Regions:
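Residues forming the flavin
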Residues: 1-176
């Protein structure tokens, strides 16, 4: 079973103004597999990241759920944070929410948090793999763009195969 840590961010007042952060922490800390849950004003800050790293080490966390603002803004931040603490960077889930009504927003936050916890329970670490690469290209289409692409690739020293569905190459240019 995973040992999951839940980290709920206030995002200053952005989240805390519309979500009862304490209620979210209380609801999520009793979920199966959760061994640590806390909240902090800015999880993306250096001190917030240290809270995450310290908890991973202290509690032996195998996965984390970060309830914060948009993954678009901070996914890389949190991925690096958990990796720096020795956790696989893909063993984390991030959820965010938007609502005006505090009760609805809090309910949604709890549901999203539970969903993220369930997902982390099932996660398996991703590992790097290498595959042999054949340095050869296939160009589909024998029009002028396909021909030029094939020539450019060949000029760069790679083998090229070009396929065309018609019996001749040149596309519309051959009709001029």
């Amino acid at each position: 079973m995973q040992k999951i840590g839940v980290f709920v961010c206030w995002c200053g007042s952005n989240i805390a103004a519309t979500v009862d952060v304490a209620a979210v922490v209380e609801a999520l800390k009793v979920q199966p597999g959760v061994v640590y849950a806390t909240d902090y004003q800015y999880m993306c800050s250096a001190s917030g990241q240290n809270i995450i790293k310290d908890a991973i080490k202290e509690y032996g966390l195998t996965g984390v759920v970060i309830c914060s603002c948009s993954p678009r803004m901070h996914e890389a931040t949190f991925r690096k944070t958990v990796q720096a603490a020795g956790l696989n960077p893909y063993m984390r889930e991030q959820c965010s929410w938007i609502h005006k009504d505090i009760k609805e927003a809090t309910e949604k936050a709890i549901i999203l948090g539970r969903s993220a916890i369930a997902k982390v329970q099932l996660n398996a670490p991703l590992t790097s793999q290498t595959s042999p690469v054949v340095k050869r290209a296939l160009v589909i289409g024998g029009g002028i763009a396909g021909i030029q692409t094939a020539l450019d690739i060949a000029d760069a020293g790679f083998e090229v195969d070009i396929v065309e569905k018609k019996p001749t190459i040149g596309g519309k240019m051959s009709q001029l």
